[in-house]
Regions:
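Cytosolic, membrane-interface loops and tails of multi-pass inner-membrane proteins
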Residues: 2-17, 77-98, 191-221
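The first (N-terminal) embedded transmembrane alpha-helix
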Residues: 27-44, 157-160
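Membrane-embedded alpha-helical segments that form the functional core of polytopic membrane enzymes
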Residues: 36-44, 48-79, 87, 111, ...
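Helix-coil boundary and interhelical linker segments in multi-pass alpha-helical membrane proteins
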Residues: 43-61, 113-128, 163-186, 236-251, ...
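Transmembrane alpha-helical segments that form the membrane-embedded catalytic/substrate-channel core
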Residues: 65-72, 135-143, 184-201, 234, ...
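Multi-pass membrane catalytic core of lipid/isoprenoid biosynthesis enzymes
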Residues: 79, 87-127, 217-242
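Intramembrane alpha-helical segments
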Residues: 100-170
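Interfacial loop-to-transmembrane junctions
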Residues: 221-222, 264-292
Length: 305
């Protein structure tokens, strides 16, 4: 009886561990950010056109499935590189907890289900955006990471594209809100990724990844890239002010400018002092900046709707 109970417990523990490994394949933090951006885009679109909440929900489900596939297959491609870096060596593939074949099957199934779901539940165009995002992330950005430091440009485009799924799923057309939101997601990533890449530059080098701090030993151009991107982010996110009116227009402009200057300040600190401590400060500022910016956009659009 005891042996049987222990066997059942062991099977249960193994099942839970296996489930956690599959969840880890989807990179939950990235998936959560994708969810937020799709919902934010859908809400902003609802202030421009009449939107069914079901369509936004369908966009979230389909996008999460495609994103899960991208994360899993990205780890398939990078499994040998991940094994060289301490921050990634415990992932399911390099640690040997999951096999390559089963992860490829998982990634293929989630991709197909996600694309079919977007096609049938929303439209072929939205499914096409989802597929283009997946291709850009898995088959362009991922291989480029070992070839050129410009990989982050492609990665930033792929990272911003889910907002297009959320927006166009509603039937909305080009509008200052989607231009501003896409610009936010695109430009925000550079200071954020430069801080991360600087902190883990030695591990990236050990893994054979050509991030800018790996080739830019002093970090000058890494910091310049962060400063320029943070600077461009201010006018780009001020664009939606033309869709607002009255006091909302003024308040939006002031708050967005203040948040942008705060982000730029963090990047300038990094330019002046390229230490790990300042890089962490920039990273923390970036993690505060993005959700606050999306919240300001959503609230401003809601007030004027």
């Amino acid at each position: 009886m005891t042996a049987t109970s222990m066997s059942v417990q062991e099977v249960s523990d193994q099942s839970v561990a296996r489930w956690r490994d599959y969840v880890a394949l989807t990179k939950p933090r990235i998936s959560f950010m994708v969810l937020l951006t799709v919902v934010a885009a859908g809400f902003l679109a609802s202030t421009v056109v009449s939107v069914s909440a079901l369509r936004v929900f369908n966009a979230v489900i389909g996008t999460l499935l495609v994103a899960a596939s991208g994360s899993a297959l990205n780890q398939c491609v990078e499994r040998l590189l991940d094994a060289r870096m301490s921050r990634t060596s415990n992932r399911p593939l390099p640690s040997g907890r999951l096999g390559l074949t089963e992860v490829v099957v998982f990634g293929t199934i989630t991709l197909c289900v996600g694309l079919v779901y977007l096609w049938l539940a929303i439209s072929p165009m939205v499914a096409g955006i989802g597929f283009a995002t997946w291709v850009m992330y898995v088959w362009i950005y991922t291989p480029l990471k070992t070839r050129t430091w410009t990989n982050t440009i492609v990665g930033a485009v792929a990272g911003a594209m889910p907002v297009l799924i959320g927006w166009f799923a509603t039937g909305a057309t080009i509008h200052p809100w989607i231009i501003g939101l896409f610009s936010l997601l695109f430009l925000w990533q550079f200071p954020h990724f430069m801080a991360i890449a600087w902190l883990y530059r030695e591990e990236y080098e050990a893994g054979g990844m050509q991030m800018l701090p790996v080739v830019d030993r002093r970090g000058f151009w890494t910091a310049i890239k962060a400063v320029l991107s943070a600077g461009l982010l201010i006018p780009a996110t001020l664009l939606p002010v033309v869709a607002l009116e009255g006091w909302t227009q003024i308040i939006y402009g002031l708050v967005v400018a203040a948040l942008g200057v705060f982000y730029l300040y963090g990047a300038c600190l990094f330019l002046r002092d390229r230490s790990d401590g300042v890089a962490r400060k920039l990273l923390r500022i970036s993690l505060l900046h993005l959700p606050l910016m999306m919240l300001v956009m959503v609230l401003s659009a809601w007030v004027c709707s």
